[in-house]
């Protein structure tokens, strides 16, 4: 009999023949070795599609019971983090040692391993995705053996943003830097017309633009400045006079400190407080990453269909990402602008809009976030990743029987 487990948003039901929550790496390796096929790992469940669905005959591996390892080496400035650890937990430990991650995503409650495996990112023209600091990957492969992959090896380009296709990540080693403080400055009513996107995007260490596409412009700008940088000069919009939430009408107390008040990096780079624990999300999410040189044209394309987009949209966030070296990284090989859409939780209403949005953006070579809602065909995805053939070969090398290849991955790799 299959067991049903839902994701965080509740829009996907994972049907698995078995669900295991191993408590040790040895127990995990034993479960993997005994599994016939369809082994998929999940920790925080923050994906919005079937990327982690093993199917009715497969095995779902929940990693949240594994030891919450966060071993900091202050001399090497690295941290070894277990496969089930979330960023909020990791950040507190790292900061206590006087060190920092270079960037974080908007939500600190997501797992480290799942985030880097799907290409998740924060913002900043000089900041790479969350996979960028990874310096070693530890995997349990199909036969239950442990494999370590580090930079300099031919396999490393496919090992971090791996979509779960190579094995189950038991630990990652990440590079760190000295701890720093950040002030978060919010502005309102930034016009789209006449926007100098490059200047705006580079105005802070991390910059996010928010709109609901009901008007041609941005209702909010979140500018995060390291305190060792100059105060932001941002004459294009008005400073916010009240605390804000990215979604209009939502309580701002859930968000990290605003008004430029300096604070530790891990309490400012995310948009949401770690102590605010979200329950199942009343939302769906999509995101498209495309060359930053096309940012204004892409925004104009969305603006032209805003009457279609706005009725099912909660908020849209525009961010930037530096180029990524991972073969399946959505910002692989290019300076990137990322257009993120938080939809209402109504799949039937949202999917037609997603299709229309993808048509509007198609000319700009968009790559959808691997873990969010999209309708882009597997054939189109293969054409947008020049190293996908190398990744396919690596997956077959480490998992020759396809034990970790579910329907989502089979369509992508074997089509």
From Swiss-Prot:
GO cellular component assignments: membrane
Keywords assigned: FAD, Flavoprotein, Oxidoreductase
Purpose of the protein: Oxidase that performs selective oxidation of the terminal primary hydroxyl group of several alditols, with a reduction of O2 to H2O2. Shows highest activity on xylitol and D-sorbitol, and to a lesser extent, can also use galactitol, D-mannitol, and D-arabitol as substrates in vitro. Is not active on D-glucose, D-xylose, D-galactose, D-mannose, D-fructose, L-sorbose, L-fucose, myoinositol, glycerol, ethyl alcohol, and meso-erythritol.
Catalytically driven reaction(s): an alditol + O2 = an aldose + H2O2; xylitol + O2 = D-xylose + H2O2; D-sorbitol + O2 = D-glucose + H2O2
Species of the source: Streptomyces sp. (strain IKD472 / FERM P-14339)
Temperature remarks: Optimum temperature is 55 degrees Celsius. Is stable at temperatures up to 65 degrees Celsius.
Cofactor: FAD
EC class name: oxidoreductase
Pfam families, alphabetized: ALO, FAD_binding_4
Residues in FAD-binding PCMH-type domain copies: 12-179
GO molecular function, one term: xylitol oxidase activity
Modified residues (Pros-8alpha-FAD histidine): 46
Cofactor note: Binds 1 FAD covalently per subunit.
Assembly information from the UniProt record: Monomer.
Similarity comment: Belongs to the oxygen-dependent FAD-linked oxidoreductase family.
Lineage top rank: taxon: Bacteria
Binding site for FAD: 106, 111, 114, 118-121, 169, 319, 369
Keyword Transcription: no
Residues noted as binding xylitol in the record, renumbered to the chain: 106, 317, 319, 342, 372
Protein name (database record): Alditol oxidase
């Amino acid at each position: 009999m299959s067991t049903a487990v839902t994701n965080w948003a509740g829009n996907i039901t994972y049907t698995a023949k078995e669900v295991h929550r191993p408590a040790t790496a040895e127990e995990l390796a034993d479960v993997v070795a005994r599994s016939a096929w369809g082994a998929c790992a999940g920790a925080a469940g923050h994906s919005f599609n079937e990327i982690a669905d093993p199917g009715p005959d497969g095995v779902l591996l929940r990693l949240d019971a594994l030891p919450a390892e966060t071993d900091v080496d202050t001399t090497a400035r690295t941290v070894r983090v277990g496969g089930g650890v979330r960023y909020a937990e990791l950040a507190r430990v790292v900061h206590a040692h006087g060190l920092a991650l270079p960037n974080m995503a908007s939500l600190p409650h997501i797992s480290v391993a799942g985030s880097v495996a799907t290409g998740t990112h924060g913002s900043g023209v000089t900041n790479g995705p969350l996979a960028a600091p990874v310096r070693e990957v530890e995997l349990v492969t199909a036969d239950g053996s442990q494999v370590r992959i580090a930079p300099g090896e031919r396999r490393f380009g496919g090992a971090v943003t791996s979509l779960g296709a190579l094995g189950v990540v038991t630990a990652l080693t990440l590079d760190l830097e000295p701890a720093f403080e950040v002030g978060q400055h919010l502005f309102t009513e930034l016009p789209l017309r006449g926007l100098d996107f490059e200047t705006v995007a580079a105005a802070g260490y991390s910059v996010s633009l928010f709109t609901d596409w009901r008007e041609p412009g941005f209702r909010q700008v979140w500018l995060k400045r390291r305190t060792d940088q100059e105060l932001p000069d941002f004459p294009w919009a008005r400073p916010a006079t009240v605390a804000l939430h990215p979604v209009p009408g939502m309580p701002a107390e859930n968000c990290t400190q605003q008004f430029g008040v300096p604070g530790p990096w891990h309490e400012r780079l995310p948009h949401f407080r770690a102590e605010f624990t979200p329950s199942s999300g009343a939302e769906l999410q999509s995101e498209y990453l495309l060359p930053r040189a096309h940012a204004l044209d892409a925004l104009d394309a969305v603006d032209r269909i805003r009457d279609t987009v706005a009725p099912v949209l909660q908020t849209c966030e525009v961010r930037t990402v530096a180029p990524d070296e991972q073969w399946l990284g959505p910002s692989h090989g290019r300076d990137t602008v990322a257009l993120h859409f938080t939809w209402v939780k109504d799949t039937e209403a949202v999917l037609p809009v997603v299709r229309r949005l993808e048509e509007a953006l198609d000319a700009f070579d968009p790559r959808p976030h691997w873990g969010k809602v999209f309708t882009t065909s597997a054939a189109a995805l293969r054409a947008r990743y020049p190293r996908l053939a190398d990744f396919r070969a690596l997956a077959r090398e480490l998992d020759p029987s396809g034990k970790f290849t579910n329907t989502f991955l089979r369509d992508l790799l074997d089509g």
